[in-house]
Amino acid sequence: MSRSMSRRPVVASLALAPMLGAGAAHAEGSVGIVETRKFVTRDFKLQGGAVLPEMTIAYETYGKLAPDGRNAVLLTHGFTSSHHMAGRTTANGAEGSWDGLVGPGKAIDTDRLYVVSSNMLGSSYGSTSPASKNPATGKPYGPDFPDISLVDIVNAQKALLDSLGVKHLVAVAGPSFGGYQTFQWGVTHPDFMDGLVAVVSAPKGSGGEAAVKSLIDQLAKDPNWNGGWYYDKGGIQTVLTDMRVATLKRYGIDEQLAAKFPDKAAREAEIRKRAESWSTVFDGNSLVALRKASVRFDAEKDMAKMKAKVLYVLSRTDKLFPPSIAPDVMAKLKAAGVTADYFEIDSDFGHSASGLDAAKWAPRLKTFMAGAEKRS
């Protein structure tokens, strides 16, 4: 395993909101008010050989870990989204992206399962990333942030789980880039889980280095880019907002907002508002670091290492990972000796279907999770 920790890891807690008291009521099926915590470890060795002197991983948890440490589920998130996947961070805050799937009595049942939702290494929601302070300079890593891989992201999560006392996972589950992580878990730590739920995703990245160059070229259109050293020059929010608008439209946001905003101009204004909010948080260099990791990702070549059962889920209207790729992926899983099932979400919400149309695939997920629990 490509990590080295010369000093004892530290688990820190950063509360974003007070937790519900033991006697406080919450909506049926909800995990209630949640908080982000932070795990910190030292001297984390990356697959490429570089060492992060200090690494932080932000995460949320839902449910309670069993004494034997074997009732856990790991949730993995998408490329530009966060680890907030269930409950709310404040009473009036937004629900987590998989709130319809995670909670008491839901498909991923927190009455029985301990769920860990990890912000991936390199992301902009609390984990170590290019915007983090480089101990050597006291300034953000920026473009000097070392290349990371899906193996590094998974091994960082494994270090987190070890610190929490998790001995075995019932399943790993996640959408999009989270599906990449799910497949990578299956080949990097094949004995550590009983189920893999890869959603609107694939076992191999696409686009190649040309996709990385294209991304950098887009970011460089902002006059503050400065080769990626924009932190003291006002940032690159303008170009990030424009890019986010385009991304949201690829994800199917027009269809999502059509009922609430039937007027096209009002809908466009809402999309831009959401894009502007995102661009105040997400770092351009994180986009580059994660894009590099994604185009180099390839769990397909190591599929024969997988031991867990796979549930592969796509969305009927997804333009990023269309259902047309399913036969090839399923054939390769079968050829590698992997037991796998396929499910297609009949949704108009494209790449966002797994959360927005949770009810349309929750029964299938619940059945799969019940089987994985029995195997655990």
Language-model-derived ranges and their functions:
Residues 27-75, 79, 83-89, 376:
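Catalytic-loop region of hydrolases
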Residues 319-325:
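Conserved alpha/beta-hydrolase "acid-adjacent" motif
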Residues 60-134:
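N-terminal cap/lid subdomain of alpha/beta-hydrolase-fold enzymes
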Residues 336-376:
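Catalytic active-site module of serine/aspartate enzymes centered on a nucleophile-bearing elbow/loop
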Residues 192-277:
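Alpha/beta-hydrolase-fold enzymes
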Residues 168-207:
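Conserved hydrolase catalytic core segment
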Residues 306, 312-314:
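Short beta-strand/loop motif that positions the catalytic acidic residue
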Residues 139-144, 151-170:
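Conserved acidic catalytic loop of the alpha/beta-hydrolase fold
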